């Protein structure tokens, strides 16, 4: 029991013990707290009081105090010096990526250009279409942009023909239009007897003789150029070309071995030579042959159109089916002439390939073209326009400008006048001469007397009153009271054999009056003669609206006009009978079905039976058809009668403003002056004479060619002519479009066989922007003549020490230049790649055509040889300059002609003053002597006129219009003044050789983003040069603001700073209390009449202000930003190059001051060493006042002795640290970047890491100017991206060649370097130092100037610079200046004013002397071009000096 109690009491005891322990622990903790409180409140204050009550003494002497003070001051200086005064070096950490430079040869520069070039070189070529339809669609583009109905009409009767390798096809273009849809066709032309075998043997020697290379070529595949580019010959043909000429014998001329050489073919006894190769997707027929397919109707009745289509149209392939029989018959023929005439002129056979040796030809038959002519006559005129456009742009341009066969074009007009010499009745001519003779002596002194008949002033009398009664061909006095016959009895044609345009039964009076005057008859007779000459002399040449097809002409583009139709004008023939005759008459021989809508015929037949002749009258009244007399009336209205005095030039050579001249009396002489000798001293040669009844200016009007000749009157006699202006002539042809076909047909009949051959073989290549014309390494089988557009020459080279290829831009080809003759004549591969900068067109001359023409006309070979020789000489000159140059520059800048033909002005965002900018730029271009035109959407629509909304013609008209403007004007400015979605915006971008991208410099949002116009620019992938034009309100650039624009714009290659006022919209302030002024403004806004008056007054004031600004633009200041931009864009830029020379470079400030005083503009600035400093100051502000002050401030800081002493360091790398020098430059330039400079600027430095000369055009200005001024030993090199940069003067102390690469035409080069000591030395083979020291102090020594070690090191360092200076002096266009500053040392910065006055006095005196002697360069916009040679005075320009 007790045990249980004891166990129960155990927890109680345990709880008591734990309670006691807790109590003790709490007491202990309270004791610790008390201890802490006692120490903090009692002990520590007691100890502090005890310590403070003691006395502490420190004994220091004065030296110790000074030392401690100096140490403290040194520490503070070190902290301030390296912590707070090195802010200019923070750009390495902050903007290291921003400071991109063209330095560092290891790193690629000019990123956008290299990237774009490489992209288009590496781009895979577009795949060719693989089916017949795609090939056909490619070839049908030669007709232009056809309507859907016309396209279906041409294609629904199309057939195909397959040809194997052992078959030969006679190319008879009368059967239809032929297109190669599969394979490659070889076209051969007949070799005449004049071209003997010896000549062809000589041709074969130009081939390749390397057997190994030919064997390698045999294994390669055929290369093709995309997008109608250079159709290269395959490798087998190139091998045969070289190997087929062994032992002086052409295999192609051997009957047994003709297949071994594709260049020649023997068919029976007739030899053929390869003319061209036509690949799939190209037309086999000539485009001009289409004119023969629109065959005029030969039936006697104009209401039977199906008669002309009755004969079946079949493919004439006699040389395929009956080749053996024909060849056998020809072999037995002994007459060579008969044999030559029997063989076809052109034959076609497939080209042998590895996979297939057959071709498939699609044939559009002649009947299809006849149906198109009948149903859609307007579309027929579109095709004729395309034919004439190609004839002018490709054939005639190439013949005249490149081949030099201008005589063939002259023969055309001579044959025209010989074939039709149509005179006028003598009584009409005598009456006109008598009226002209009564004009009076005062009027006769004028150049020409115009007799243009006003539409209202038709006649002065209702009866004919003849002024001439002499020898009238019409006897009797009744002539004075009856209408005059306009037919000369001598020139009348038998109407039964050939129906003329004027039918006697249907003659309608010319005027609105009942009777005609003598002048009216004269005009009608002249027009009739002109029509007969140009081919409009038969009724079948005009369109006839036929009854069966009239209902089909529902399209707006196919409204045919009825001329001379008996249904309208012949009352003798019932219309109903004619219709029934037409409907029921079909041809049984039609091999190609002619479809007609039966429902339309049935309804028309019922309609005609019910209405009868009444319908004809209603149709006549409603449609008011055009008659032949209306046409003659229209031409007669625009015709002028002129009397031209003797020895008067009517049309100047190369003039566009010409017309058609019909000689009434007297004669006109045609003179020609060759292009090579076209100058004021050259004399023109008389070509032929146009007598009475002939016409002059035919080619200019019909084809659209500019006048190739000068038209003059004889020295002793004048001429009476009828004149139709070219513009009036073209407008009338557009109105009466059906006249184009007969006129074009007449033109084709006049072309010689040689011209037809050239037209057939020439290729019209269209290369879209960014596509490759020919690639590097391709076989050269033809050369190109640039018709329009621009091509960039790119070469791909392997970079040293890297597997990557480096793309180098070599130059650009523009309008009128030729490409690829050297490779063709040397039978080599393409050495470069050609990329289309914009949509371009070329005329490709195949190698085979060139060889044929060269044997027929040796003058062509001579001319092309001269052209090739000049190109080779220019390339050798460039190569020699590169070989003799001792400088390896890391700059990738190669000279590309900036003479841009087309300039596009494109805004970044909407709302920018594009129109004002364009007006000022165009005015500046005109001020520098450029023939320029500004083209906007309104002007383009005005030119297109009624064709503006015709999709089938608008592109052809636009391309022809743009090509015409490029030929007529030196520069065409495209103004993009439309929204982004507009077609005109895309047209402007695609047409520009150079795109000027306008941007508001203060627009921070657009600077960091991409504008909507820029997005379109990127989307179109244009390769044209793009320059950013930053528009500033004031002539000031915020530091670092330009790089913000350029950082993310890889597509921008350059930039310009332009000062121009921009109107900004006032920002609206928040709502507030309405004032009296606001209420009045609100009332004013509601009054529309006041608003209209205000806008009218405002527009007048703004226009007046704009005119005043444009007038004062060039004369007001030689520092005009628009003049500077115009000179840069026109290769007329003025460059200023300032050389290095230490303190002697202060004279640069004086030279710049003299330039300002004489009003000489500066567009580009470059410099070395101290020249980079002064040039940078001038480029930054373009103000001489600020330059003088800042240069003097820098000189004072550098010449401070104490600053240099404190900057001294232990001379391991240099004597001074460079801190004071760096800070002195930074104090002047601050954080300004080179991109912020107002004028384009560059400086050079010597990269001792890569052993190159680096060119700096971007980055912080102070850093690279300091690098260019880093004299070795005195200053440490500037470290930039791992490379050490020193003074640029070690390699080129006067970088003139670098300025030349940037397109500067006139360069003022100022040299202030030390004179190179070239005293001869002869001190033997050994040299004692003691002897050198003795000779320096010996006044009688012959060798006092023996160099020491430092002199030798300096001379060694400047070896390259000395040679570069001598090369710069010999460079054309460089004006070398050297002020007399040899007496000043390199570090004489303390003599600032003295050196400045030396440079100012020298330059001012020199420029004044040049002005007096007329030796100053003819700077564009500064010197009147026409006044310089005639003693014209220089334009005086003044300026207000401001900071």
Curated annotation (Swiss-Prot):
Record field: catalytic activity: a 1-acyl-sn-glycero-3-phosphocholine + H2O = sn-glycerol 3-phosphocholine + a fatty acid + H(+)
Keyword Membrane: yes
Superkingdom field: Eukaryota
Residue ranges annotated as motif GXSXG: 1167-1171
Lumenal side: 1-59
Acidic residues: bias regions: 210-235
Keyword line: Endoplasmic reticulum, Hydrolase, Lipid degradation, Lipid metabolism, Membrane, Repeat, Transmembrane, Transmembrane helix
Enzyme class, first EC level, given as a word: hydrolase
Motif range (DGA/G): 1287-1289
Activity regulation description: Inhibited by organophosphorus esters.
Location in or out of the cell: Endoplasmic reticulum membrane
Domain PNPLA stretches: 1136-1300
Function: Intracellular phospholipase B that catalyzes the double deacylation of phosphatidylcholine (PC) to glycerophosphocholine (GroPCho). Plays an important role in membrane lipid homeostasis. Responsible for the rapid PC turnover in response to inositol, elevated temperatures, or when choline is present in the growth medium.
The protein's name in its UniProt record: Lysophospholipase NTE1
Organism: Lodderomyces elongisporus (strain ATCC 11503 / CBS 2605 / JCM 1781 / NBRC 1676 / NRRL YB-4239)
């Amino acid at each position: 029991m007790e045990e249980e109690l004891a166990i129960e009491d155990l927890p109680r005891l345990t709880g008591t013990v734990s309670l006691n322990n807790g109590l003790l622990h709490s007491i202990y903790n309270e004791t610790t707290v008390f201890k802490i409180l006692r120490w903090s409140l009692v002990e520590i204050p007691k100890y502090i009081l005890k310590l403070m009550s003691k006395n502490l003494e420190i004994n220091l002497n004065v030296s110790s105090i000074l030392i401690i003070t100096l140490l403290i001051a040194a520490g503070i200086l070190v902290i301030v010096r390296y912590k707070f005064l090195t802010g200019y070096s923070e750009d390495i950490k902050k903007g290291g990526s921003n400071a991109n430079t063209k330095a560092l040869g290891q790193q690629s520069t000019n990123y956008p250009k290299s990237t774009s070039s490489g992209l288009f070189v590496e781009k895979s070529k577009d795949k060719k279409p693989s089916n017949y339809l795609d090939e056909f669609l490619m070839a049908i583009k030669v007709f232009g942009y056809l309507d859907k109905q016309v396209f279906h009409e041409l294609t629904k009767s199309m057939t195909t023909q397959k040809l194997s390798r052992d078959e030969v096809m006679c190319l008879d273009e009368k059967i239809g239009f032929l297109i190669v849809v599969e394979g490659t066709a070889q076209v051969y032309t007949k070799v005449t007897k004049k071209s003997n075998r010896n000549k062809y043997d000589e041709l074969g020697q130009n081939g390749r003789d390397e057997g190994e290379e030919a064997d390698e070529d045999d294994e390669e595949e055929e290369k093709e150029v995309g997008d109608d580019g250079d159709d290269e010959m395959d490798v087998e043909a190139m091998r045969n070309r070289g190997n087929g000429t062994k032992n002086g014998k052409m295999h192609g001329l051997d009957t047994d071995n003709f297949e071994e050489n594709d260049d020649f073919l023997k068919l029976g006894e007739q030899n053929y030579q390869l003319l061209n190769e036509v690949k799939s997707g190209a037309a086999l027929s000539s485009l001009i042959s289409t004119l023969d397919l629109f065959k005029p109707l030969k039936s006697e009745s104009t209401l039977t159109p199906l008669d002309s289509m009755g004969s079946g149209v079949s493919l004439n392939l006699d040389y395929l089916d009956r080749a053996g029989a024909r060849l056998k018959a020809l072999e037995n023929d002994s007459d060579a002439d008969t044999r030559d005439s029997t063989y076809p002129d052109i034959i076609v056979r497939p080209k042998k390939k590895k996979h297939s040796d057959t071709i498939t030809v699609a044939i559009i038959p002649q009947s299809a073209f006849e149906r198109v002519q009948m149903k859609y006559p307007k579309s027929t005129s579109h095709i004729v326009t395309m034919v004439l456009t190609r004839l002018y742009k490709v054939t005639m341009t190439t013949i005249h400008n490149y081949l030099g066969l201008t005589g063939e074009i002259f023969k055309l007009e001579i044959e025209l006048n010989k074939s039709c010499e149509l005179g006028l009745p003598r009584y009409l001519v005598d009456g006109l001469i008598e009226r002209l003779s009564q004009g009076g002596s005062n009027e006769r002194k004028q150049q020409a007397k115009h007799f243009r008949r006003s539409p209202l002033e038709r006649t002065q009398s209702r009866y004919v009153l003849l002024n001439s009664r002499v020898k009238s061909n019409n006897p009797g006095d009744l002539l004075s009271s009856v209408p005059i016959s306009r037919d000369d009895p001598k020139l009348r044609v038998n109407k039964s054999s050939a129906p003329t345009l004027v039918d006697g039964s249907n003659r309608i009076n010319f005027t609105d009056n009942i009777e005609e005057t003598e002048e009216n008859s004269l005009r009608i007779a002249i027009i009739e003669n002109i029509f007969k000459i140009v081919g409009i002399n038969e009724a079948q040449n005009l369109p006839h609206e036929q009854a069966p097809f009239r209902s089909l002409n529902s399209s707006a583009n196919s409204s045919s006009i009825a001329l001379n139709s008996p249904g309208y004008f012949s009352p003798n023939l019932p219309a109903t009978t004619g219709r029934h005759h037409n409907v029921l008459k079909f041809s049984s021989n039609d091999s190609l079905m002619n479809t007609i809508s039966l429902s339309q015929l049935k309804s028309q037949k019922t309609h005609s039976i019910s209405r009868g002749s009444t319908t004809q009258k209603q149709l006549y009244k409603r449609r008011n058809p055009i008659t032949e007399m209306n046409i003659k009336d229209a031409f007669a209205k625009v015709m002028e009668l002129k009397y031209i005095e003797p020895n008067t030039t009517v049309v100047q050579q190369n003039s566009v403003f010409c017309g058609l001249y019909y000689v009434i009396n007297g004669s006109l002489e045609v003179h020609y002056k060759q292009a090579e000798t076209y100058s004021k001293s050259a004399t023109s040669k008389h070509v032929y004479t146009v007598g009475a009844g002939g016409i002059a200016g035919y080619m200019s009007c019909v084809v659209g060619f500019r006048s190739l000749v000068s038209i003059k009157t004889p020295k002793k006699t004048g001429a009476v002519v009828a004149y139709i202006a070219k513009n009036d002539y073209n407008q009338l042809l557009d109105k009466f479009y059906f006249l184009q076909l007969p006129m074009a047909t007449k033109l084709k009949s006049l072309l010689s066989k040689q011209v037809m051959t050239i037209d057939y073989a020439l290729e019209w290549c269209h290369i879209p922007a960014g596509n490759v014309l020919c690639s590097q390494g391709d076989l050269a089988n033809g050369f190109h003549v640039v018709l329009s557009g621009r091509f960039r020459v790119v070469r791909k080279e392997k970079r040293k020490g890297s597997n990557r290829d480096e793309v180098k831009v070599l130059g650009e080809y523009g309008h009128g230049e030729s490409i690829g003759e050297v490779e063709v004549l040397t039978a080599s591969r393409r050495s470069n790649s050609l990329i289309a900068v914009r949509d371009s067109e070329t005329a490709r001359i195949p190698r085979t055509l060139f060889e044929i023409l060269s044997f027929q006309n040796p003058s062509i070979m001579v001319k092309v040889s001269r052209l090739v020789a000049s190109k080779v000489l220019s390339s050798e000159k460039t190569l020699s300059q590169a070989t003799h140059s001792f400088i390896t520059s890391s700059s990738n800048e190669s000279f590309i002609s900036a003479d841009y033909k087309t300039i596009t002005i494109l805004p970044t965002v909407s709302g920018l003053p594009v129109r004002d900018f364009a007006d000022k730029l165009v005015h500046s271009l005109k001020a520098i002597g450029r023939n320029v035109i500004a083209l906007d959407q309104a002007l383009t629509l005005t030119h297109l006129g009624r064709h503006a909304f015709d999709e089938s013609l608008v592109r052809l008209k636009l391309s022809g219009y743009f090509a015409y403007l490029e030929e007529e004007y030196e520069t065409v400015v495209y103004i993009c003044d439309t929204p982004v979605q507009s077609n005109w915006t895309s047209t402007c971008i695609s047409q520009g050789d150079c795109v000027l991208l306008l941007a508001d410099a203060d627009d921070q949002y657009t600077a960091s983003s991409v504008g909507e116009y820029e997005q379109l620019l990127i989307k179109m992938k244009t390769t044209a040069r793009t320059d950013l034009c930053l528009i500033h309100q004031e002539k000031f650039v915020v530091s670092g603001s330009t790089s913000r624009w350029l950082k993310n714009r890889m597509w921008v290659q350059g930039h310009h700073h332009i000062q121009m006022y921009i109107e900004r919209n006032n920002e609206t302030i928040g709502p507030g209390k309405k004032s009296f002024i606001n209420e009045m403004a609100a009332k004013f806004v509601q009054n529309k009449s006041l608003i209209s008056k205000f806008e009218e007054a405002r527009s007048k004031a703004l226009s007046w202000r704009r005119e005043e600004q444009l007038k004062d633009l060039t004369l007001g200041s030689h520092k005009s930003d628009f003049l500077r931009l115009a000179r840069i864009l026109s290769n007329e830029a003025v460059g200023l190059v300032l050389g290095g020379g230490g303190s002697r470079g202060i004279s640069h400030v004086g030279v710049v001051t003299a330039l300002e005083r004489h009003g000489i503009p500066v567009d580009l600035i470059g410099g070395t060493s101290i020249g980079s400093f002064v040039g940078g100051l001038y480029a930054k502000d373009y103000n001489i006042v600020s330059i003088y002050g800042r240069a003097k401030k820098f000189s004072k800081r550098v010449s401070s002795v104490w600053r240099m002493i404190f900057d001294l360091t232990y001379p391991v790398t240099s004597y001074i640290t460079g801190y004071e020098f760096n800070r002195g430059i930074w104090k002047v330039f601050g954080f300004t970047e080179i991109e912020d400079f107002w004028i384009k600027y560059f400086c050079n430095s010597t990269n001792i890491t890569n052993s190159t000369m680096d060119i700096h055009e971007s980055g912080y200005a102070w850093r690279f100017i300091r690098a260019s001024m880093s004299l070795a030993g005195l200053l440490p090199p500037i470290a930039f991206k791992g490379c050490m940069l020193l003074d640029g003067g070690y390699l080129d102390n006067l970088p003139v060649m670098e300025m030349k690469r940037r397109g500067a035409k006139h360069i003022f080069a100022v040299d202030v370097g030390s004179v190179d000591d070239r005293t001869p030395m002869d001190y033997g083979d050994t040299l004692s130092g003691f002897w050198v020291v003795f000779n320096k102090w010996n006044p009688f020594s012959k060798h006092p100037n023996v160099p020491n070690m430092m002199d030798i090191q300096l001379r060694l360092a400047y070896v390259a610079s000395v040679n570069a200076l001598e090369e710069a002096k010999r460079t054309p266009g460089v004006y070398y200046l050297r002020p007399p500053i040899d007496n000043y040392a390199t570090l004489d910065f303390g003599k600032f004013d003295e050196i400045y006055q030396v440079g100012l006095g020298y330059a001012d005196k020199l420029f004044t002397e040049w002005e007096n002697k007329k030796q100053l360069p003819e700077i564009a916009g500064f010197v009147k071009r026409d006044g310089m040679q005639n003693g014209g005075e220089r334009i005086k320009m003044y300026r207000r000096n401001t900071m």
